[in-house]
Amino acid sequence: MEVPAGNILDAEGRGVRVLMSGLDYERVVLSGIGTGIMAACLDEIMPYMVARKQFGQSIGRFQLMQAKIADIYTRLNSARSYVYEVARACDRGQITRADAAACVLYSSEAAMLVAHQAVQAMGGTGFMNDTPVSRIFRDAKLMEIGAGTSEIRRMLIGRELLEAMPA
């Protein structure tokens, strides 16, 4: 296919480089989706923890459920802090491919762990297809496989870190 000269980005034959140059920023943007998934999980399970009664009390009073809440809260805030820090590096023009990939890797895997815990916390209700937590769980899985799998992200991070080592 012939591309008019006025539509060519960068130099001829370097289109892949132009395309790849935006991937680091895309990875940071996608990382924000992971934090949104985790926040949605917390928003869904908190009212459930209060409303659902077992043995005459809210299940949120059980230590194991409190531990789930604590783990979700901690992962959410850890991922959010990392995403914000890498986003600030983007704003300063100091983004690294390893940080962008690590950010989306951590955020997506944390989102999957959190979504799994949200389903667990809600039991059978959380697994039903018509509940938000079930949809969130499926969305979280997509974060691990869409726009590059976790395995590809790990390979990229390892390669970037090794290439940065002095010879």
Model regions and ranges:
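Alpha-helical interface subdomain recognition
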Residues: 12-14, 18-167
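Long, acidic (Asp/Glu-rich), low-complexity accessory segments flanking structured domains
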Residues: 1-17
